[in-house]
A protein has these predicted regions:
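N-terminal [4Fe-4S]-dependent radical SAM core
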Residues: 2-17, 24-32, 173, 178-222
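Flexible glycine/acidic-rich beta-alpha junction loops that bind and position SAM and/or redox cofactors
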Residues: 27-30, 129-131, 228, 276-277, ...
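Glycine- and acidic-residue-enriched helix-capping/strand-helix junction motifs
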Residues: 29-44
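Radical SAM [4Fe-4S] cluster-binding motif and immediate context
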Residues: 198-372, 381, 393
């Protein structure tokens, strides 16, 4: 089923038991790239699908960021109208994004006021369960939710009705938090991780109703957790080391979507290549399917630059239809990389990135001005303006196609936040609320000697320069019309000829090397003669140029609209307070 079909007024035959809500982003977050991409979080859909399959109840979800149903007087999804139209017995909220958590709490309070029990999971409520339980949530699910949710529903629902004293049964369920009948906080203990992901149901995107538009891309989740422990991240802490479902399960999931007409996929795993042999196996299956079925689809994955060290993996990803890599470079400053525990040097990042740029579109993700602490072992003595110059140089040297530069976000549960809290550098929520925790706002007090306004504005300036260009370019070449006119006319044969000459020289140099390697193993991408191969490569380079221009033009529109909203916001007053506190600390 294509999502959104029920938004056209179709009647639901079976009365739903549970509604899952993916809360709306705040206004400014809706204008960043994440807010523009229509793609639901996999976690809550996986839990709801599991309940539908194993518990035999009807469920549905709404994504408030892609919603075409009834609206209230404030222009928000009208849950009163939804409850009248399709009354439910339980509410389940997605609490994985700090910047939308306030909206989730507001919606939960409405359902709670109607006598409907409310459940929430996700990294934010996992880290701050007491906040959630005092904000409209009855039960917080910690960690993975598929098995836990089934036990919760069994405790809450009997013969289609909510059990009044269900809280007495909750203490037997491991992995949850709640307030008992005396309003005392109860945590039932850490639950053992799910061992067999193959036993879980594939997330059913068809349960999302009242959609405004089709998905930008289909999210695919193969694994959970991460083997790395970056200071700013919570994935390893929440899910532990990486584990994955079988190659066959993921392949069949993607294949089923392709057979139903979907062509764009995004693998949401933090590192697509955590298990390289299995990743190569999956890519071979996808490539064989593409070759035999003649169906074309496009895949974007998140990886670390280490994938550049494995030629077999690169070839397999190209064979599978992987065209774009999202890479968390984070910083072009070695001291900051060490502080983050990235386990890589700037020199390695540049070397690997240049190689990967020959085969894929590279989207680089960065954190600007990573904070240091009183006891930091690694500190950079560069000024913010010097750091900005290092970023510009890195973008060019590493041959990155598109970028996003954010401030460090002190996510609840992260080691970064704990360190900032220890030095009293997290402002109260009354000053900087959760709605600002999307990377585009400075949400902590900088270290002594660092200007808060400069730290806030330099990442924005970098994005503005990258996508909008100089003042002259913004006004004379609005929407890149000169670039489009050139690239689609006289520039097309010129660019193609340049790309062909470069590729021919490169392929000629690599020809003997490939011969030696491939005598021992079978190639996935059949190597043709150097003339034809260079033509194919030059055509791919030309398409990549056009793609980058399209993304840059779209990105410029996002940045332009965001800057307008930002200039009208009251955030500058919060920045002044951060600056005042920094000055007071310097005086002391």
């Amino acid at each position: 089923m294509r999502g959104g079909e029920l938004s056209k007024g179709e009647e639901v035959v079976v009365e739903p038991m549970i509604i899952g809500v993916i809360p709306q982003f705040p206004p400014l977050s809706k204008q960043n790239i994440y807010g523009k991409v229509r793609m639901p979080p996999v976690g809550i859909l996986s839990v709801l699908t599991q309940l539908k399959r194993d518990f035999g109840i009807e469920v549905y979800a709404i994504d408030e960021n892609n919603y075409g149903g009834p609206m209230d007087s404030n222009g928000l999804p009208d849950h009163r109208a939804l409850q009248k139209r399709q009354p439910v017995k339980l509410f389940m909220g997605y609490g994985g994004m700090s910047n939308s958590i306030s909206r989730m709490y507001a919606v939960a309070r409405y359902y709670q006021s109607q006598g409907i029990p409310t459940i929430a999971g996700g990294s934010h409520v996992d880290a701050l369960p007491r906040e959630a339980l005092n904000s409209g949530i009855d039960v917080v699910v910690h960690g993975e939710g598929e098995e836990t949710a089934i036990e919760i529903v069994r405790a809450m629902i009997h013969e289609g009705r909510v059990v009044k004293d269900y809280k007495k049964k909750l203490e037997q369920i491991i992995g949850i938090s709640y307030l008992n009948e005396h309003d005392n906080y109860v945590f039932t203990g850490k639950r053992e991780p799910i061992r067999n992901l193959d036993a879980l149901a594939d997330p059913d995107l068809g349960i999302v109703r009242f959609m405004a538009k089709d998905w930008s891309a289909i999210p695919i989740s193969r694994g959970r957790g991460c083997n790395f422990k970056c200071e700013f991240c919570v994935v390893n802490k929440q899910y532990g080391p990486f584990k994955a479902s079988s190659v066959e399960k993921v392949f069949n999931n993607i294949k089923n979507y392709v057979e139903n007409g979907y062509k764009r996929f995004f693998v949401v795993d933090d590192n697509f290549a955590q298990n390289i042999p299995e990743t190569i196996e999956l890519c071979k299956l996808l490539g064989d399917y593409r070759s035999k079925s003649k169906k074309r689809f496009d895949i974007m994955v998140q990886v670390r630059t280490e994938v550049a060290e494995n030629n077999d993996l690169i070839e397999a990803m190209r064979y599978a239809g992987v065209s774009s890599l999202a890479i968390g470079y984070e910083s072009p400053i070695n001291e900051e990389l060490k502080a983050m525990r990235k386990g890589v040097t700037v020199e390695k990042l540049v070397q690997r990135s240049r190689k990967l740029s020959q085969f894929f579109h590279l989207h680089g993700m960065f954190i600007f001005g990573y904070p240091s602490f009183n006891d930091s072992k690694y500190k950079s003595d560069m000024s913010l303006s010097q750091k900005a110059k290092a970023y510009y140089k890195f973008f060019k040297d590493a041959r990155i196609d598109t970028i996003q530069v954010f401030n460090a976000v002190p996510l609840p549960g992260s080691e970064l936040r704990m360190k900032l809290e220890a030095e009293n550098r997290i402002p109260p929520l009354e000053e900087i609320g959760w709605d600002k925790y999307d990377g585009l706002f400075l949400c902590y007090r900088p270290e002594n000697g660092v200007d808060a306004f400069e730290l806030q504005n330099l990442p924005l300036a970098m994005m503005k320069k990258r996508y909008l260009g100089s003042f002259l370019k913004r006004n004379l070449n609005y929407a890149n019309w000169m670039n489009w006119a050139y690239d689609l006319s006289i520039g097309f044969p010129i660019n193609f000829s340049i790309y062909y000459a470069k590729r021919f020289a490169h392929n000629l140099k690599q020809k003997e090397q490939w011969k030696g390697i491939m005598r021992k193993k079978e190639r996935l991408l059949h190597k043709r003669n150097v003339f034809y191969e260079s033509l194919v490569d030059a055509w791919q380079d030309t398409k990549k140029r056009i793609k980058n221009l399209a993304i840059t033009t779209y990105g410029a529109d996002i940045v332009r609209k965001w800057m307008r909203l930002y200039e009208k916001s009251s955030y500058s007053s919060a920045l002044k307070k951060l600056t005042q506190v920094a000055v007071e600390n310097n005086i002391r």
